[in-house]
UniProtKB/Swiss-Prot annotation:
Sorted UniProt keywords: Carbohydrate metabolism, Lyase, Schiff base
Annotated EC: 4.1.2.57
Organism: Salmonella typhimurium (strain LT2 / SGSC1412 / ATCC 700720)
GO molecular function, one term: 6-deoxy-6-sulfofructose-1-phosphate aldolase activity
Keyword Lyase belongs to the record: yes
Enzyme class, broadest EC rank: lyase
Metal-binding as UniProt keyword: no
Functional summary from the UniProt entry: Cleaves 6-deoxy-6-sulfo-D-fructose 1-phosphate (SFP) to form dihydroxyacetone phosphate (DHAP) and 3-sulfolactaldehyde (SLA). Can also catalyze the reverse reaction.
Subunit structure: Homotetramer.
Stated family: Belongs to the aldolase LacD family.
GO BP term, example: 6-sulfoquinovose(1-) catabolic process
Name of this chain's protein: Sulfofructosephosphate aldolase
SUPFAM superfamilies: Aldolase
HAMAP family found in the cross-reference section: SFP_aldolase
Length: 292
């Protein structure tokens, strides 16, 4: 059996410059907020995702697709560049309490062998972390996910995202990110996708300290995501996180959110989003070169 390794989803430098287009109801809300005709049809999301994969994947070491809206179509249309690995989301998002993702379970419909035949090299699992929910349940889900990936020769990418507790209103996001890393940072996955401390804001020295603290609890390669980070601050966030020990990024919003809802989508992705992704890839290579 062919077992993929981390090198299969990195750039030649050994760093990760990966594009996410697996946002689901959150992306629908973004289109609505940008003035798109509501209700926003599934086809609007599918078209955007497939276009983004076609136009941006040549500049990414991997692209993350979701089964709900775009994976099948991307495979059928050969949307992903040969030079870019494919990652498939194996999480089922459950909406509730007025938010698009209130709970997450491992998608039982995922067929690991079939996605591997289609060219996927990794699966990704979102793990919602709340201080007042059962840690063992999270660990069990990650263990089951890792087994699914590794028994099929696929890489396992986990994405712990912190949320306020179900009960009570005390929520320290920064501490929660650290606590989630303490719990899941040595859980046997191949890659840890994490929220940027401090939303990438403020003094560089503070960001570096927070990122170094995070690095101390993650016992596997890690990358940052861009949700919640101003896209203008994201390149700096990548630099600082990598200085602290991260190995790159797996991000969507910082690359393409500014073109959502604009006319001439393909043109916008080519002229606005592609240069952003190219630059981020250069930053990753630059930071990896400093490690040699």
């Amino acid at each position: 059996m062919n077992n993929y390794t981390i090198k299969d989803i990195t750039r030649a430098s050994g760093g990760f410059a990966m594009l996410a287009v697996d946002q689901r109801e959150a992306m629908r809300l973004m289109f609505a907020a940008a003035g798109a005709k509501t209700p926003v049809a599934d086809s609007v999301l599918t078209d955007f995702k497939v276009n983004a994969a076609k136009i941006l994947s040549p500049y990414a070491s991997a692209v993350l697709l979701d089964q709900q809206f775009c994976y099948r179509q991307a495979v059928e249309q050969n949307a992903v560049a040969k030079s870019c690995a494919m990652i498939v989301a194996a999480d089922d998002f459950i909406p509730g309490n007025g938010i698009p993702v209130d709970n997450v379970v491992l998608d039982k419909k995922i067929n690991a062998q079939a996605v591997k035949r289609d060219g996927a090299k990794a699966l990704k699992l979102l793990v919602l972390w709340r201080s007042d929910e059962d840690a063992q349940q999270r660990l069990n889900m990650v263990k089951e996910f890792n087994e699914l990936c590794h028994s099929n020769g696929l890489l396992s990418i986990i994405e712990p995202v912190v949320r306020p507790p179900r009960c009570g209103d005390k929520f320290d996001r920064e501490q929660a990110i650290i606590d989630a890393a303490k719990e899941l940072g040595d859980s046997g996955a191949d890659l840890y996708k994490v929220e940027m401390p401090l939303y990438g804001k403020g003094a560089r020295s503070d960001l570096l300290t927070a990122s170094q603290r995070l690095n101390g609890h993650i016992n596997m390669p890690w990358v940052i995501l861009s949700s919640g980070v101003d896209e203008k601050l994201f390149p700096r966030a990548v630099r600082v996180a990598m200085e602290a020990g991260a190995s790159g990024f797996l991000a969507g919003r910082a690359v393409w959110s500014s073109v959502i809802g604009l006319p001439d989508t393909e043109l916008m992705l080519r002229d606005v989003s592609a240069p952003k992704l190219q630059r981020l890839g250069e930053i990753v290579d630059e930071m990896m070169a400093k490690r040699r």
